[in-house]
Amino acid sequence: MKRGWLALLAAAGSAAAQPLLAPLDGPGSLPPPPWREVLLPKQTLPRTRFALVDIDAARALRIESPRSYGNLVHELAPPDAAARQLSWRWRLERALDGAALQRKAGDDAAVKVCVLFEHAIARLPFFERQQLRLARLLSGEPLPAAALCYVWDPQQPAGSVLPNAYTRRLRWFVLQGSGSPIGHWRSEQRDLRADFLRAFGDEASELPPISAVLVGADADNSGGDGLAYVAELELR
């Protein structure tokens, strides 16, 4: 994902009304604002392709990643301190050959749903705190200090929790893994407080405010070509 976590974590800004997330729906080809595309700084890679489509009598976001990188981000301003549950449906149609989340060379995902938190930098271990400060300086972005990314990854056992290969400030939760049949819809519901404490419980005893939610895919490291769908994404 080469520096991809910088773009992935860089979210803060637009006002959000009730419901907390604008739906992945609508008559257009892309979700309505405040959903917006976020790429790498000065990205030269192909962009991940997003499109609203009708599939199985429902509206869904189609995500295609031909050796690409890209995210759709929904910022919450001010960050929301009350939300505790995230739910959605998703379907992996085409997996990424060569993806391996535990290695930088394979740090790709055919589909990911991520939550970014306004976690206090003072709670980080000293070395990670200094790394994040440097990353913020170099990127020019107020990068959050914690993020959870839920992925569908046939290379990992379902239930795995892994640090990102580039930074421990991002943790992967593999919800659908090896043995999960592709081409079928799966429904997810996550207790964000429980997941955050599982990932970062040594730094905090409560869930920080949520600054953004994103949906994305990348295949820039593995050189693959993934295809997936996400629908009915709700934060409450």
Name every feature range the model reports, one short phrase each.
Residues 75-86, 179-182, 206:
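Extracellular/lumenal carbohydrate-interaction signature centered on repeated Trp-anchored short motifs
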Residues 24, 213, 231-235:
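Extracellular beta-strand elements of beta-rich domains used
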Residues 11-17:
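N-terminal signal peptide c-region/cleavage motif recognized by signal peptidases
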Residues 108-110, 118-166:
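Extracellular/luminal beta-rich ligand-recognition
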Residues 48-71:
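Short carbohydrate-recognition loop motifs
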